[in-house]
Amino acid sequence: MNKGIEAQEILQIRQDFPLFRNDPVIYLDNSATTQKPDAVLNAVSEFYGHDNANPFRGIYDLSEQATERYEAARETVSKFIHAERPSEIVFTRNASESLNLAANCLAELLLQPGDEVIVTIVEHHSNFLPWLQAAKRHGAALKFLECDAKGEIPLEALEEAITDRTRLVTMTQMSNVFGREYDVKAAAALCHSKGDIVVIADGSQSVPHIKVDVQDLGVDFLAFSGHKMLA
């Protein structure tokens, strides 16, 4: 690609963001949160200015329109990650809340004293602390998968860690520190072949940057954040 054209395209893209139009800053913290383009800001402003109402609770026009928009957004997200049906999509404030919700709910259903939860050493705190707390509450063991010198998590290490007391495995699909992609699909297949093990994937870094097909991935739960992908 011609570097001059590429540079011009970048300049044009920057014009979609109020921050970048008014400031020459080079923003490199997109793994934490992304800046918002005009299209997103205008859509939010338009809704609150002209269409604001609570969804799912009113029989007047504004409320019914809000419900339709809410469900349309759910369907859009469902198609984006190729979920089997829109009802599989649960809106929360962010991936951290999603993972906390999963930990609190699943621990009540799955964990007994002596059971095991497996996490990797490369997890964001949002996919580590909730499981640590859940394991303590229920008398379960939290087991860590170490990475090798290249930052990889060998599938063999996961297979060795799984026992007949393993109830849940949770891991990131892409590290927020290394940027490395992890083979969650293979991990999910391995876990499910070993028994009724629930598999959770943190897709906070992967969903914004690579194509994610949740049905092909084979995990039981996938968490990600809209605010990390311009929304």
Predicted regions and their residues:
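Pyridoxal 5′-phosphate
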Residues: 1-231
